[in-house]
Structure formats: structure tokens, C-alpha cells
Design a protein with these regions (language model features):
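N-terminal pre-domain/capping segments
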Residues: 1-55, 84-87, 122, 223-278
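Hydrophobic faces of well-ordered beta-strands that scaffold small-molecule active sites
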Residues: 2-4, 25-29, 56-58, 100-102, ...
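Flexible loop residues that form catalytic
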Residues: 6-7, 61, 160, 204
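Active-site acidic/histidine proton-transfer and metal-coordination neighborhood
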Residues: 20-26, 32-126
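The substrate-binding groove and active-site-proximal loops of carbohydrate-active enzymes
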Residues: 28-35, 72-76, 132-133, 173-178, ...
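Residues at structural and domain junctions
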Residues: 68, 75, 99-102, 130, ...
Length: 278
């Protein structure tokens, strides 16, 4: 199956292809930002359902928390706006019977996202749990998964590796089974909470992401996190050196990058078939 925006594709053709091949389709929608966006959003919801989706992904912020927001007040205003938007679109989702999965996208901590979902208390809005993203917010992986599992509607399945860096650490996606996440255990937690979820493999072949958690600007939106999370995160990095060199793309030919990307994803599917049989 696939999780993707329609991007102008005929939704009925997508549905026919999925039904023919026996797969699945999950949508990917942009959130409306102002009231005048609601009509276009409802059209996208309707088309996503016509394509056969019962779940669609959204992200709340278009960037990483520690890069996009400079002050706590700025972040708080964004949080309130995001919660209000989800409240406003809930009747549209209910009308078309499409569930919306909000990804933990390096924007909200798992505590904040779980609190938002609890306040909404809607069967039509839940979480797309990305197994790796909250490492960028200094979280322990199992804690993240356990906190978000009650709301899970979809999954981005990743394995991750970490390396020390002068300003914090480097975070990389790595082929499933080669990183330090206990994926079988994390998946078991999620499936126990929602047996109907699908596991979407996400394996982007790119340069490591710098997590600048030794800088003051990183903590601008959650200053207390330096005291509560930093030491444990750095210990975790030191305790889990990469088992294999992480992917990188700088200075490499596009054709070689694409070949490695395909190989990494094929390896991921093979790992899933061998290790996640139900």
C-alpha cells in the first residue's frame, strides 16, 4: 500500500488500482489555516475517501520546532491555533467518515500531542506515530510510543541511529533492523492499542540531521527540557554507536543515491516480512 497526497490523480483510478492489487491507500492532506480554506479542505477529504482511504495524514507544523519557533509565546500561539483548526474540521471528517492522523513531526512533544488528542476526544482525529521523530526532541523511544499508542491511527516505521556531534548529536534513518530501536517491541505496543493500523515504511536516504541540543536556541520553546531530558539523551547517544555507517548523500551522484534509496527500502520490506508476521 501507499500513503500519499493525490496530487491531481483521479481518485477513482487510485481506488480501482488498490482494489485490483489488494493493497491499501492512506491519504495525505494539508490542513486549512483560515476559514476560507475549509471548502477546499472538504473537497480534498471527499476525494481522499473516493480514492478508498479511511485514514489521512496531516502535519501541524511545516518545520522542526527548534528551528521554526524562537520563543515559548510563539510556540504557544501555534499550539492553540492548531488545536482550534482540528476542532473546526472535525465535523467535516465525521461527515465524510475519514480519520485524520496527526504526525508527531518534530514539532510537539509526545506529552503535548497526547494532551491535544485527549482534549479533542474525537474518534475522527488521532495520531500518526513516527517511531523515530521524537528522538529529535530528546525523548526515549518506548516512552514516546507508549504515550501516543492510545491515539494511534497510522504508523511511519523507521529505524534510527545516533552519533555524537559538537552541538548535540546526529540523527539518521537507517534500514530496518540496523539501528538501535527495538522495533518489534514498539510495533507490538502500537498494534495492541489498534490492531487495524497499517505500518508505512519510511526510509529516506539523506545526510544525518543535526540535533543542536547543546545550544541555547534549541531550548527556547521548552526551557525545562534541558534539565529533564538532555543528560539522558546524551547518554543514549553514547550507548548506541551506529552498527553500520549511516546513509549520506553529500557529494554523491544522484543515480547512486537513488539506487541506495531503493535498496534500503527493499531491505526494509524484507525485514518487515521476516520479523513482523502476524
Amino acid at each position: 500500500g501507499i500513503q500519499s497526497p493525490l496530487r491531481g490523480s483521479d481518485p477513482h483510478a487510485i481506488r480501482a488500482l488498490v482494489e485490483q492489487d489488494g493493497g491499501y491507500y492512506e491519504g495525505d492532506l494539508p490542513l486549512p489555516r483560515v476559514k476560507s480554506d475549509l471548502a477546499a479542505f472538504e473537497t480534498s477529504v471527499r476525494q481522499t475517501r473516493e480514492a478508498g482511504a479511511t485514514v489521512a495524514r496531516v502535519v501541524l507544523a511545516g518545520g522542526r520546532r527548534y528551528e521554526r519557533f524562537k520563543t515559548r509565546a510563539e510556540f504557544d500561539a501555534f499550539y492553540v491555533q492548531a488545536r482550534d483548526i482540528l476542532t473546526r474540521i472535525e465535523p467535516i471528517l465525521k461527515r465524510h467518515r475519514l480519520k485524520l492522523a496527526v504526525e508527531n513531526h518534530k514539532d510537539l512533544t509526545s506529552e503535548e500531542l497526547a494532551a491535544m488528542m485527549g482534549a479533542l476526544a474525537s474518534e475522527w482525529i488521532g495520531v500518526l506515530v513516527d517511531t523515530g521523530n521524537n528522538l529529535a526532541l530528546l525523548e526515549e523511544p518506548q516512552t514516546t510510543i507508549e504515550r501516543l499508542a492510545p491515539f494511534v491511527l497510522s504508523v511511519h516505521l523507521k529505524d534510527m541511529c545516533v552519533q555524537p556531534d559538537a552541538e548535540g548529536f546526529l540523527l539518521s534513518e537507517t534500514p530496518l533492523g540496523t539501528g538501535f530501536l527495538n522495533l518489534k517491541h514498539l510495533v507490538a505496543i502500537l498494534v495492541r492499542s489498534n490492531p487495524d493500523i497499517v505500518l508505512n515504511l519510511e526510509m529516506a536516504t539523506r545526510d544525518p540531521l543535526r540535533i543542536p541540543c547543546l545550544t541555547d536556541t534549541y531550548f527556547a520553546t521548552f526551557p525545562g527540557r534541558r534539565e529533564t531530558h538532555l543528560e539522558a539523551a546524551l547518554v543514549r547517544v553514547k550507548a548506541h554507536p551506529p552498527n553500520y555507517p549511516p546513509p549520506s548523500v553529500s557529494g554523491r551522484e544522484p543515480a547512486r543515491i537513488l539506487a541506495e534509496e531503493e535498496a534500503n527500502n527493499r531491505d526494509g520490506f524484507s525485514w518487515m516480512r521476516a520479523n513482523l508476521r502476524t
